[in-house]
């Protein structure tokens, strides 16, 4: 999803440089860039053998235009390689194949060795920190600047030490560990900081365990979650088929540079430290809508009941005095008409009978409708994947089956996963539980979970049910996994299979049976849970280095669908198609002059959205399904795209017309200007008209009214989604005032020329008495803009009264100031190239 808009930007920059009188071919990566196509495939088909083939065919059918752009980029750019779709997830491919740990090159006849470093256009780039490689996620616009030779600037971070001791107990997995660490570090506060793991416990973790911990750095807020090189690193490099001379180089250079950890290595000095005894980790999930909200497996049923009232959609309610009894809605009738026989309200109140595959199934609050083994976070770890396979084997042998209403999926981050599950003999058991491979990509984790069966969808939507997903992913933000699924829980692949067997989350898995065997005996989770010895022995016998060398020897080849794509004639300029709804030339460089206009104050601004705490980039720029009745869906229909061909917002990121219409359009976003009503709508002021965010923005822009957004803490948490900033500027938003910003989104706002402003300590929209209906003047931008300065804000209410306050300008360096005054980072680079400075 981030690769296509990056290439679109680079292609547009070539046009822009030509228009400014420069040589367009100078827009070319000077730093090696690998683009792995992993975000496009969706779970349209599942639960049968041909699901993978059909999903891939559908992927190419939907994304032919986008992939043709990437084929052009392969030919047009040097230092640029593409890993075709169907290969795996970028971070797992990096871990298993691309990462060198220690690079070498010849310079002036001398061999040079230096540590591997990288930036990636996905926040989970940090996964490679588990291999001893320093790297993190950045916005696509920052990555483009780095590719073009611009240095990456950052403030020197504090380093928090996370000490690990002990050994994981039986029953606990690396997933349980990372959810525990995420909870701890979020509470400690590590946003903008480096986290480094140390302590004797590191020797008791495999490298895939470490990669799992490093992967979820964005979820606990850190820039990186670093593990030093040690013996496990070398073992992993050998185990993934890396050449012997490379492994020797990594060991020798790391030791020479003092980068190699042993149990005798002294504890480093840190800004602050935390400690976790691995022996205390226990089976856990996280949810229903934040990765840091860990739930002990033993408390899962009670926690769901406690969370349920807050998850019920507007217009529906739980019956008074009970947790989940009668199905009610304010102002609506629950009578089932003669033409609605596919969905029938059951006697039990929050329960509906829906027809599915010829049988009646009960859908209620807490029903699991999606169970997905997904994401590089966990599918990169053979222990939890084999654990899931062993549990599936024991379940099948006891006669258990997945509940029929559960949409199952297994989407490994690497083809090697399928190889070792096949070699171990476990894949057939997973398939008997309908966990067939549906693709090699991000899929459910990114929101490409595909549609639910029509009758189940209708039962949920019409009755306001709070259904659940259980996935082995890294994020569960509101409406990310599926728009109709309000309770989403992160867990290990082993627990994903377990919850698919039960079909509900309101169950005590320690004491209630998963089901009953053929003799009617109850089968408890403990009865089929794999032992550590079973997992260890299976991994040792099934996983071979040759699997990695075989798969990655053809990593750039692609399947017959990729090879069938037309290879464009080599051209330095991309041939934009005026009628394309996937790839359009963006407006960011249109009419740009060589000279930079001075920064100006923001006057008579209106609030487009007044938002609360922990607004994610998913809230700001959704990745999933495009609602047909909202502006983006209307645009596509006006351009003769049928609803069935909408694809997702993520796949449309090469078209700014779609993306700006979807900005702040998440179905779960709550604009407090509308008293927290869900959806991408706002109040146009001063008329009071309720409009979509996009339509209100267009009306404001016609009147030349600048816009701002006001928000709470952790604004922009989540994915490194540059479209959350691109869409913001295209909607005419000049500034965002928040209590705090997540690192990547703050950088993205600056990189797009949007001013990030932070309330001073102790101040919030509530304490200041802001309603969002005021007219705002932000002064001091024109005459005192410098790193870390303050500017003045005057908010004039409808009755003429004023609220005055200062805000901190989150331009953290001189480079930030330069980017902002140029209108963005890419505009800065383009001007420098046109002047011959770069």
Task: Enumerate the predicted regions with their spans.
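Fe-S-dependent hydro-lyases/dehydratases of central metabolism
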Residues: 1-838
């Amino acid at each position: 999803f981030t690769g296509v808009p990056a290439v679109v930007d680079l292609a547009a920059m070539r046009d822009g440089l030509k228009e400014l009188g420069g040589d367009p071919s100078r827009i070319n990566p000077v730093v090696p860039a690998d683009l792995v196509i992993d975000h496009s495939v969706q779970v349209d088909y599942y639960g049968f053998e041909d699901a993978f083939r059909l999903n891939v065919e559908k992927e190419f059918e939907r994304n032919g235009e986008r992939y043709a752009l990437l084929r052009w980029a392969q030919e047009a750019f040097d230092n640029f390689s593409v890993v075709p779709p169907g290969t795996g997830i970028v971070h797992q491919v990096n871990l298993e194949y691309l990462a060198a740990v220690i690079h070498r090159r010849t310079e002036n006849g001398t061999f040079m060795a230096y540590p591997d470093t990288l930036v990636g256009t996905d926040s989970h780039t940090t996964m490679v920190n588990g291999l001893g490689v320093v790297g993190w996620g950045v916005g696509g616009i920052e990555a483009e600047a780095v590719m073009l030779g611009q240095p990456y600037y950052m403030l020197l971070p504090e380093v928090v030490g996370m000490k690990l001791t002990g050994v994981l107990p039986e029953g606990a997995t690396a997933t349980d560990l990372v959810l525990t660490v995420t909870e701890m570090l979020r509470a400690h506060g590590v946003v903008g900081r480096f986290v480094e793991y140390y302590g004797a416990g590191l020797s008791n973790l495999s490298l895939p365990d470490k990669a799992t911990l490093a992967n979820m750095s964005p979820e606990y807020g850190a820039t990186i979650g670093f593990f030093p090189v040690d013996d496990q690193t070398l073992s992993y490099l050998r185990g993934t088929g890396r050449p012997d001379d490379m492994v020797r180089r990594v060991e020798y250079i790391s030791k020479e540079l003092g980068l190699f950890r042993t149990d005798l290595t002294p504890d480093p000095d840190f800004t602050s430290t935390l400690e976790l005894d691995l022996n205390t980790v226990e089976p856990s999930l996280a949810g229903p809508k934040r990765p840091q909200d860990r739930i002990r497996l033993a408390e899962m049923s009670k926690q769901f009941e406690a969370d349920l009232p807050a998850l019920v959609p507007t217009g529906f309610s739980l019956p008074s005095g009970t947790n989940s009894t009668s199905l009610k809605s304010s102002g609506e009738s629950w009578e089932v008409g003669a033409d609605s026989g596919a969905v029938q309200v059951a006697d039990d109140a929050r329960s509906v009978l829906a027809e599915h595959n010829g049988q009646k199934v009960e859908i209620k609050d807490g029903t699991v409708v999606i169970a997905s083994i997904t994401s590089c976070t966990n599918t990169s770890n053979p222990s939890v994947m084999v654990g899931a396979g062993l549990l599936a084997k024991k379940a099948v042998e006891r006669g258990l089956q997945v509940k029929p209403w559960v949409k199952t999926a297994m989407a490994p981050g690497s083809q090697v996963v399928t190889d070792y599950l096949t070699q171990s003999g476990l894949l057939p058991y997973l398939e008997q539980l309908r966990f067939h491979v549906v693709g090699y990509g991000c899929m459910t984790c990114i929101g490409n979970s595909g549609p639910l069966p029509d009758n189940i969808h209708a039962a949920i939507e019409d009755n306001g049910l709070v259904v659940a997903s259980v996935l082995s992913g890294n994020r569960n933000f509101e409406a990310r996994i599926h728009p109709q699924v309000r309770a989403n829980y992160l867990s290990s692949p082993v627990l994903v299979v377990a919850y698919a067997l039960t079909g509900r989350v309101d169950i005590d898995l320690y004491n209630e049976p998963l089901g009953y065997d053929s003799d009617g005996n109850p089968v408890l989770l403990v009865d089929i849970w794999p032992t550590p010895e079973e997992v260890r022995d299976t991994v040792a016998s099934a996983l071979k280095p040759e699997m990695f060398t075989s798969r990655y020897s053809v990593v750039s080849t692609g399947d017959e669908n990729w090879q069938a794509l037309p290879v464009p004639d080599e051209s330095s300029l991309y041939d934009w198609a005026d009628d394309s709804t996937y790839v359009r030339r963006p407006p960011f460089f249109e009419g740009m002059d060589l000279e930079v206009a001075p920064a100006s104050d923001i006057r008579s601004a209106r609030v487009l959205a007044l938002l609360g705490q922990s607004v994610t980039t998913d809230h700001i720029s959704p990745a999933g399904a495009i609602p047909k009745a909202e502006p983006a869906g209307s645009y596509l229909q006006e351009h003769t795209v049928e609803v069935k061909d909408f694809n997702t917002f993520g796949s449309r990121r090469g078209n700014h017309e779609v993306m700006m219409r979807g900005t702040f359009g998440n179905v779960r976003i709550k604009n407090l200007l509308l008293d927290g009503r869900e959806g991408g709508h706002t109040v146009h002021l001063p008329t009071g008209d309720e409009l979509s965010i996009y339509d209100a923005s267009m009306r404001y822009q016609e009147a030349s009214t600048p816009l701002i957004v006001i928000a709470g803490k952790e604004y922009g948490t989540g994915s490194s989604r540059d479209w959350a900033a691109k869409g913001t500027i295209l909607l005419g938003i000049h500034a965002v005032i928040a209590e705090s910003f997540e690192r990547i989104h703050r950088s993205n706002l600056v990189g797009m020329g949007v001013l990030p402003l932070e309330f001073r300590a102790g101040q919030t929209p509530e304490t200041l008495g802001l309603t969002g209906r005021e007219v705002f003047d932000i002064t001091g931008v024109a005459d005192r803009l410098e790193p870390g300065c303050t500017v003045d804000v005057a908010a004039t209410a409808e009755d003429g009264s004023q609220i005055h306050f200062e805000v901190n300008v989150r331009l953290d360096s001189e480079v930030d100031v330069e980017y902002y005054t140029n209108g963005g980072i890419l505009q800065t680079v383009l001007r420098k190239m046109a002047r011959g400075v770069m």
